[in-house]
């Protein structure tokens, strides 16, 4: 049965990069059939899997061809490792609601039964730290059963992670969605690992993996590839391989207990964290 995973995190934290490298590792190292559904108006959730190509989004296709003609063969592309890729896209700048686009795109994919076709994992890569109605849809309506939050040892990344947990709690009991853990995408700040471990303990989850900072990630992006495609034997590829394995084998799913603002302030002061 396909496992549906939503990846959340503060804008600029490296969420899409982490998600694409994890998906690539699942396919390349673990032989899984994977699909990525980008839920960000920037439509950059699949770029590294498709060799740097910005694919035509579902919303663009809907505007151009109409709903009847917006079929899976028009909007799904296959990239590295046989990974299926689709981007929701969004409205024209300054017009309409991008969250509404996410709802429309996911509903349309479900109607065509796309998420059930020979897949092991579907990743929903969701816009930044916005937990408004549309972007909360993977959580609210049970479209995703598992959530992983990408964070770092920086103050705003932790605040965003805590806010996402608050949004989760609101919908967890009705939708059945659960938090699978925090992925630390390291920024090399002092005491980062210890801070993230304490944060995870306080909200009742696990730090599923600590991804070290490595310039090969940027080098691979410059070459329009995931790290796994660029150099599958390098240390960073092995980190993503391990993260993928931990997600595949994960059984530790919880409804988090978000911290209060006062508790968050105490935590960042304790570790001397500044952005």
UniProtKB/Swiss-Prot annotation:
Q: Which SUPFAM superfamilies match?
A: P-loop containing nucleoside triphosphate hydrolases (SSF52540)
Cofactor details (free text):
Binds 1 [4Fe-4S] cluster per dimer.
One BP term from GO: nitrogen fixation
Query: Which metal ions or organic cofactors does this protein require, according to UniProt?
Result: [4Fe-4S] cluster
- Report the PROSITE patterns cross-referenced here: NIFH_FRXC_1, NIFH_FRXC_2, NIFH_FRXC_3
Q: Write out the catalysed reaction.
A: N2 + 8 reduced [2Fe-2S]-[ferredoxin] + 16 ATP + 16 H2O = H2 + 8 oxidized [2Fe-2S]-[ferredoxin] + 2 NH4(+) + 16 ADP + 16 phosphate + 6 H(+)
* Region forming the signal peptide: none
Residues binding ATP are: 9-16
| Transmembrane domains' residue ranges | none
Read off the InterPro entries from this record: NifH/chlL_CS, NifH/frxC, Nitrogenase_Fe_NifH, P-loop_NTPase
Any idea which positions bind [4Fe-4S] cluster? 97, 132
Q: Give the protein family.
A: Belongs to the NifH/BchL/ChlL family.
Could you describe the subunit structure of this protein? Homodimer.
HAMAP family linked to this entry? NifH
Name of the protein described by the UniProt record: Nitrogenase iron protein 1
Q: Gene for this protein?
A: nifH1
């Amino acid at each position: 049965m396909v496992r549906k995973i939503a990846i959340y995190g503060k804008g600029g934290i490296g969420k899409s990069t982490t998600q694409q490298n994890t998906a690539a590792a699942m396919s390349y190292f673990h032989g899984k059939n994977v699909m990525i559904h980008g839920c960000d108006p920037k439509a950059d959730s699949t770029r590294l899997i498709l060799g740097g190509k910005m694919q035509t989004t579902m919303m663009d296709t809907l505007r151009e061809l109409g709903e009847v003609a917006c079929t899976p063969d028009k909007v799904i592309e296959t990239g590295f490792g046989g990974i299926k890729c689709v981007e929701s896209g969004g409205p024209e700048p300054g017009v309409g609601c991008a969250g509404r686009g996410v709802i429309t795109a996911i509903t349309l994919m479900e109607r065509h039964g796309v998420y059930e076709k020979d897949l092991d994992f579907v990743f929903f890569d969701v816009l930044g730290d916005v937990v408004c109605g549309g972007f909360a849809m993977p959580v609210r309506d049970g479209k995703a059963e598992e959530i992983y939050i990408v964070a770092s040892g920086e103050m705003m990344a932790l605040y965003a992670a805590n806010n996402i947990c608050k949004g989760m709690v609101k919908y967890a009991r009705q939708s059945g969605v659960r938090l699978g853990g925090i992925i630390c995408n390291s920024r090399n700040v002092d005491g980062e690992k210890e801070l993230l471990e304490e944060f995870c303990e306080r909200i009742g989850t696990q730090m599923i993996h600590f991804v070290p900072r490595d310039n090969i990630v940027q080098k691979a992006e410059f070459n329009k590839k995931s790290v796994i495609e660029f150099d599958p034997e390098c240390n960073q590829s092995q980190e993503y391989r391990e993260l993928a394995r931990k997600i595949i084998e994960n059984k530790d799913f919880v409804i988090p207990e978000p911290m209060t603002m006062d508790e968050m302030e105490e935590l960042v002061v304790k570790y001397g964290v500044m952005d």
